[in-house]
UniProtKB/Swiss-Prot annotation:
Name assigned to this protein: Gas vesicle protein K
One GO BP annotation of this record: gas vesicle organization
Keyword ATP-binding: no
Organism: Nostoc sp. (strain PCC 7120 / SAG 25.82 / UTEX 2576)
Source organism phylogeny: Bacteria, Bacillati, Cyanobacteriota, Cyanophyceae, Nostocales
Summary of the function given for this chain in its UniProt record: Might be involved in nucleating gas vesicle formation. Gas vesicles (GV) are hollow, gas filled proteinaceous nanostructures. During planktonic growth they allow positioning of the organism at a favorable depth for light or nutrient acquisition.
Localization in the cell: Gas vesicle
Family: Belongs to the gas vesicle GvpK family.
Alphabetized Pfam families for the sequence: Gas_vesicle, GvpK
GO CC, one annotated term: vesicle membrane
Amino acid sequence: MVCTPVEKSPNLLPTTSKANSKAGLAPLLLTVVELIRQLMEAQVIRRMEQDCLSESELEQASESLQKLEEQVLNLCHIFEIEPADLNINLGDVGTLLPSPGSYYPGEIGNKPSVLELLDRLLNTGIVVDGEIDLGLAQLNLIHAKLRLVLTSRPL
């Protein structure tokens, strides 16, 4: 089988940049990065309130979080993605991220989000144990036995 690059063909329809911003990996990856950024921000707030961070650590963390947020917004601009579109509505489960200003770590929000659940799990700690078989065409190609410890505390 020979693979050749796709050439410009009259049969291919050009896509608009708006259509491209809804497809591909960029929106998904930016959503994951934003979720992780907000989780880290919640952990910094929790540690700050527990006086577990020095002034320099707090300053470094806040500067890093601010730069990461700027990069997410910059990449949204480059890929023509509305930052609000990073918050996925998961139906009955709620939204992936809380609406701006509606969640503060340690407090119960009006409309819980997946981020709030993950933040609480990190704060409490959880162990997930299981097996995964990955494959295709009815072939199990990868077998994994996993134990995941999810916590914000040192192990």
